[in-house]
Amino acid sequence: MKAVIILGLVLLSVTVQGKIFERCELARTLKRLGLDGYRGISLANWVCLAKWESDYNTQATNYNPGDQSTDYGIFQINSHYWCNNGKTPGAVNACHISCNALLQDNIADAVTCAKRVVRDPQGIRAWVAWRNHCHNRDVSQYVQGCGV
């Protein structure tokens, strides 16, 4: 009985952690989901963005006390503008999606919403982490050796 309880706790902790992608696994997944070259943005830039926003973690969240919004998922998509968490005052929900959908191991919804974000005038510049860590830098290392 004790072993069953311990196993249950281990499985619960794995479930809560979510998926943390390996760099090349993420590159292949993003390519398959159509981000390579989307709106002129290279695959390496998308992988760089995910590295610095979430460290490739689908379950990453970050609360922003200033506007009471939260950033969700592998791309840290914000609840004030892009998704609905039912808590953020004045939320727009431009992606027409629940923020919880952005925390799934299957990142198809997160990719669809990221595509919506970059269609706005700011494009990929909407992400501070991209501006601080990827913009005007050699980002080829993020896809090097991945065969993509």
From Swiss-Prot:
Disulfide bonds join 24-146, 48-134, 83-99, 95-113. Its main location: secreted. Its EC number is 3.2.1.17. It holds the Pfam family Lys. InterPro entries: Glyco_hydro_22, Glyco_hydro_22_CS, Glyco_hydro_22_lys, Lysozyme-like_dom_sf. One of its GO terms (molecular function) is lysozyme activity. The active site is at 53, 71. Keywords: Antimicrobial, Bacteriolytic enzyme, Disulfide bond, Glycosidase, Hydrolase, Secreted, Signal. GO terms for cellular component: extracellular region. GO terms for biological process: defense response to Gram-negative bacterium; defense response to Gram-positive bacterium; killing of cells of another organism. Residues 1-18 form the signal peptide. It is found in: Secreted. Residues 19-148 form the C-type lysozyme domain. It catalyses: Hydrolysis of (1->4)-beta-linkages between N-acetylmuramic acid and N-acetyl-D-glucosamine residues in a peptidoglycan and between N-acetyl-D-glucosamine residues in chitodextrins. Lysozymes have primarily a bacteriolytic function; those in tissues and body fluids are associated with the monocyte-macrophage system and enhance the activity of immunoagents. Lysozyme C is capable of both hydrolysis and transglycosylation; it also shows a slight esterase activity. It acts rapidly on both peptide-substituted and unsubstituted peptidoglycan, and slowly on chitin oligosaccharides. Belongs to the glycosyl hydrolase 22 family. Monomer. This is Lysozyme C. It comes from Miopithecus talapoin.
